[in-house]
Amino acid sequence: MLGIITFIIIFGILVIVHEFGHFYFAKKSGILVREFAIGMGPKIFSHVDQGGTLYTLRMLPLGGYVRMAGWGDDKTEIKTGTPASLTLNEQGFVKRINLSQSKLDPTSLPMHVTGYDLEDQLSITGLVLEETKTYKVAHDATIVEEDGTEIRIAPLDVQYQNASIGGRLITNFAGPMNNFILGIVVFILLVFLQGGMPDFSSNHVRVQENGAAAKAGLRDNDQIVAINGYKVTSWNDLTEAVDLATRDLGPSQTIKVTYKSHQRLKTVAVKPQKHAKTYTIGVKASLKTGFKDKLLGGLELAWSGAFTILNALKGLITGFSLNKLGGPVAMYDMSNQAAQNGLESVLSLMAMLSINLGIFNLIPIPALDGGKILMNIIEAIRRKPIKQETEAYITLAGVAIMVVLMIAVTWNDIMRVFF
């Protein structure tokens, strides 16, 4: 149960942070955001703000999305002869078009619609008391659809495809950017929780409770200078010296550890503890605890994590295998393991997954943010927009590829994790 809760929290935070990036910069670019959804499936709660954005909390606590005006099937269609109730503002402009039998306004004007243009001319025409009349429609007017859903109309100037190239590009990039920011922040938080960043350039150590070194008398911040005669000046020297000293070690044999404590040099016999195929002496690298060290340490972890992911991506391209990919099932398995290991493991996993999500979404495949960014760049170079039909077909092809890949990866994960 703890693993499921951890998975939902991690996955939810990653997606919400990602989608908030798209949402925020879409609004800043003048694009009408129709909906910001947390979760998937049926609505549990909804609220419409003054800007016409619907905020929804949905039943399945997995994922979320941002729906922008002009994306996909976003056209409002009113069939000829459809009865509607028009509510006018003080200037005589239509501020509400009610196509349903609910949410009726007693002051509204009944009409049978014969024509409309809610994108360019912003007008609606129809029969009012058997007389044909045309009314101007307010730029921020709303439509109550037949099922009772109320949405804002989307004039051309607030649709995604009519925003500036720069506006669309930053809107598409903002999702991955937010994931990178989240990953860096969580890594910095992790370093602060750990008390600092491991100092691998030093031979000072932290001694693990009940470990081999602790039993031999070593204490935190002691300085190991030699192991079995091998000189130690750094953490890398220490690990290599332990490896060399224990290479042919018998079950009850010890190694000699020379260390400096309170300016006094001591040599003790330490019996290493075996873990799997390696020996340890129960020490960790000392920590750099300065505020600046912690900040830089978090950035270093994020940078290292990004390079690890990029190398994995490179390996995937040069030698593709489903076993190198992981979907929601693999993510659940990792979340479950992290939950068992404590908060620090959960934060480390969240940070890595956030950076991974950011990098993955920048791959220039249609349907991913990277594909949209690539089309924005092509449009900027050509200095003319890509046809909506062409863009739709390209995106559809990308979606098909991603769906097939996700099904294959999920099936492979299920077989690997549960069987």
Curated annotation (Swiss-Prot):
Pfam family for this entry, one: PDZ_2
Provide this UniProt record's keywords sorted from A to Z: Cell membrane, Hydrolase, Membrane, Metal-binding, Metalloprotease, Protease, Transmembrane, Transmembrane helix, Zinc
Top EC class, one word: hydrolase
Tell me which GO cellular component terms the UniProt record holds: plasma membrane
Coarse class of the primary localization is: membrane
- List the Gene Ontology MF annotations in alphabetical order: metal ion binding; metalloendopeptidase activity
Its membrane topology is listed as: Multi-pass membrane protein
Transmembrane ranges, per UniProt, are 169-191, 301-323, 343-365, 392-411
Taking every annotated instance into account, which residue ranges of this chain make up the domain PDZ? 175-274
SUPFAM superfamilies recorded for this chain? Answer: PDZ domain-like
What PROSITE patterns does the record tag this protein with? ZINC_PROTEASE
Q: Which residues form the active site?
A: 19
Q: Which residues bind Zn(2+)?
A: 18, 22
Give the location in the cell: Cell membrane
Q: Which cofactor does it need?
A: Zn(2+)
Q: Does the keyword Plastid apply?
A: no
Give the EC number: 3.4.24.-
Gene Ontology process terms (BP): proteolysis
Family from the record? Belongs to the peptidase M50B family.
Q: Which NCBIfam families match?
A: RIP metalloprotease RseP
Name the UniProt record assigns to this protein: Putative zinc metalloprotease spyM18_2031
Q: Organism source for this protein?
A: Streptococcus pyogenes serotype M18 (strain MGAS8232)
